Swiss-Prot record:
Belongs to the thymidylate kinase family. It catalyses: dTMP + ATP = dTDP + ADP. One of its GO terms (molecular function) is dTMP kinase activity. Pfam families: Thymidylate_kin (PF02223). This is Thymidylate kinase. It comes from Chlamydia abortus (strain DSM 27085 / S26/3). PANTHER family: THYMIDYLATE KINASE, UMP-CMP KINASE 2, MITOCHONDRIAL. The keyword ATP-binding applies.
Length: 211
């Protein structure tokens, strides 16, 4: 099973990813937790470069295709092998971050970027079984980030930018009610974890009945 955690800056994605991994492993499940950009040696190098605030010369298309290249390697090197072994993969960001950041808000077009994202998964159709969106007002998410000593390229963007990011994620969630779980990131993270576990259990039960 493939579970993706999405959300705006400061929503708690990384924390929920780790908590979910720990919870599933405590129940005896084989779990791989990973992130995007990243997840492979190539992906981590792309992450360091693109997110560096000093990297300002990239065109929107260059940025997009670097993200897609990192994802292609991530799928080949980590995600697909884990899924084929029957493991649960929990990923901090995936396709929808690219669709929102580069397509909807970045101006490259939702449909154009969506089609490119789908082309990256190839014939195996590596798509999430469940996407969990940690939703939080942009200003509150950015306040959480103020505790950091440094900020990456996207975290440095304006409040208006991050508000559009939130709206983009919510619009995707509304169009995919069958596979999206929207969580209030202002609630205790343990509550979000419990809701994700409930959704996972229901999904796992449905998949077992299909066999």
């Amino acid at each position: 099973m493939f579970i993706v955690i999405e959300g705006c800056e400061g929503s708690g994605k990384s924390s929920l990813t780790q908590l979910l991994k720990d919870k599933l492993m405590a129940e005896g499940k084989a779990v791989v937790a990973t992130r995007e950009p990243g997840g492979s040696s190539l992906g981590e190098r792309v992450r360091d470069w693109i997110l560096d605030p000093s990297t300002t010369e990239l065109s929107p298309y260059t940025e997009l295709f670097l993200f897609l290249a990192a994802r292609a390697q991530h799928i080949t090197e980590k995600i697909l092998p884990a899924l084929e072994l029957g493991k649960i993969v929990v990923c901090d960001r995936f396709h929808d971050s690219t669709i929102v950041y580069q397509g909807i808000v970045g101006g490259l077009g939702k449909e154009y970027v969506t089609n490119l994202c789908h082309s990256v998964v190839g014939q195996k159709k590596i798509l999430p079984n469940l996407t969990c969106l940690l939703d939080i007002p942009a200003d509150e998410g950015l306040k959480r980030k103020q505790q950091q000593k440094s900020f990456d390229k996207f975290e440095n963007q304006s409040l208006a930018y991050h508000t559009k990011i939130r709206e983009g994620f919510l619009s995707l969630a509304e169009s995919r009610l069958d596979s999206y779980l929207v969580l209030d990131a202002r609630q205790p993270i343990e509550e979000s974890l419990n809701k994700v576990m409930t959704a996972y259990t229901e999904l796992a039960l449905c998949k077992s009945k299909e066999r």
